[in-house]
Amino acid sequence: MIHSNISIQINGEPFNCSKPISLQFLLNYLDFNSERVAVELNDILLPETLFHSTYLNDQDKLEVITIVGGG
């Protein structure tokens, strides 16, 4: 498998990583609980069921929103 570096944006901030990388792996690496986040990839809201099978590409834009319960 050939690895290459890609540049993506996470919540508007640049982030460099190796390709191939799945969305689930990246969320785990960044300590996000995938059951408590909403993720937009290039302006498309992704269901959690696609996190494992979605691989990131150069120049992708992610918005990760943490869902917090309260009362």
From Swiss-Prot:
Q: Cross-referenced InterPro entries, in alphabetical order?
A: Beta-grasp_dom_sf, Mopterin_synth/thiamin_S_b, Thi_S, ThiS/MoaD-like
The compartments listed are: Plastid, Chloroplast
UniProt keywords, alphabetically: Chloroplast, Plastid
For this record, an example GO cellular component is: chloroplast
SUPFAM superfamilies xref list: MoaD/ThiS
Record-linked Pfam families: ThiS (PF02597)
- Chaperone among keywords: no
The protein's matches in PANTHER family, at most eight in alphabetical order, are given as: SULFUR CARRIER PROTEIN THIS (PTHR34472:SF1)
The UniProt family comment states: Belongs to the ycf40 family.
Instruction: From the Swiss-Prot or TrEMBL record, give the protein name.
Output: Uncharacterized protein ycf40
Q: What taxonomic classification does the UniProt entry list for its organism? A: Eukaryota, Rhodophyta, Bangiophyceae, Bangiales, Bangiaceae
Gene this chain is encoded by? ycf40
